[in-house]
Amino acid sequence: MHVAEVAVNVILLLSMGWTSDSLCSPTIFYRDCWIRRFPGLLINLEESQKLGAQFLKYYSESTGQKCSRSCCLRKDVSCNLAVFYHSPIHDNINCLHVHCPTLESCILEPGTSAILYNITDGIDPDLLVFEQSPTYLNTRSSSNRWDRLRILKAMNLDKQTTTINGMLPSTEAPSSTTHQDLVVNTNSTSYSKELTTDFWARFTSLNESITTKINKVSPSTDFISNPDNKTISPFFEPIDTKLSHMPVPPGLNSSKQLLNKTKGYNSRNHTSANEDEVSVTSKTWLVSVALCTSVIFLGCCIVILASGCCGKQQGQYKPGQRKSGSLQIKNRNHMKENSS
């Protein structure tokens, strides 16, 4: 009976251990690293090295947890795979650190006495709960590398779109200059820059269309001059360029060529053309107001003059004289009657 009770207790303890092992999550978080545990797997190091995997370190460690955490703490290289062997092969060496640049570069195979750990950069779950944005992207994980590249491409496209939409020209310079082409003039000739990359080619075509519109309005622009009496556009720096000759109006001074200076705004586009339209509309409004005011003033003057003339004409009549004349006539008639 005693032996049977001991056997039952041992079975219960083993079942509890298996249950707790199955309930434990294979993923843990440690020092900005997500560590995923895969028991029963190991790596074929020779074949993996042929495909681009990099062997980092092979040493002795007490537990698999320490082996995986030491891989996470490596700062010199990106360690994203650790293998812990329960039964060391030789000289008590049981911990292996490997860097896999891609998923296909590391070949896995089953192994009963080994545990494979996949280490990836991550964010503290507490920070995720409090909705704090990450300050870095995942660079350790080979599985998330393509996602990172896609994110970077999307961010670059957004920045390019914002930059192009925000780079509408705002001009501030002396009003005597009207030449607006993006040129660098040395000896009565200007050189326009032609960019080689696709993005800069699109930007150049867009900038040319914008320059054409500005030339129709003919505003003035700022420029930046260097000690060699050359003007340099603030958005173009020396990049593999080709020079093409363009004619320059003879009335312009070669030492005072002006270039477009565009100022980008994230929330709105502000151009000198809009300023000209606003000034034209304001001038038209002022002219109309002045005309209306002058017409009203002239009307008031005419009314005042007319009323004054009417008053003068009415003032020439003398009703008293009429009354006195009629009285004299009556008196004369009365005297004639009396005399008769």
From Swiss-Prot:
Q: Does the keyword Membrane apply?
A: yes
Question: Residues annotated as region Disordered?
Answer: 320-340
Q: Where are the transmembrane segments?
A: 285-305
List keywords of the entry alphabetically: Glycoprotein, Membrane, Signal, Transmembrane, Transmembrane helix
- A Gene Ontology CC term for this entry? plasma membrane
Which ranges does the record list as Extracellular topological domains? 25-284
The annotated topology with respect to the bilayer is: Single-pass type I membrane protein
Check the record and name the InterPro entries matching this protein: MANSC_dom (IPR013980), MANSC_N (IPR011106)
Citing just one GO molecular function, the answer is:
serine-type endopeptidase inhibitor activity
Glycosylation positions?
N118, N187, N260
Q: Which domain of life is it from?
A: Eukaryota
Query: Which intervals hold domain MANSC?
Result: 37-117
Q: Does the keyword Kinase apply?
A: no
Tell me where it resides.
Membrane
Task: Give the range the annotation lists for the signal sequence.
Answer: 1-24
Main location per UniProt? membrane
UniProt topological domain (Cytoplasmic) ranges:
306-340
What are its GO biological-process terms? epidermis development; epithelium development; extracellular matrix organization
Protein name per its UniProtKB record: MANSC domain-containing protein 4
Q: What is the lineage of its organism?
A: Eukaryota, Metazoa, Chordata, Craniata, Vertebrata
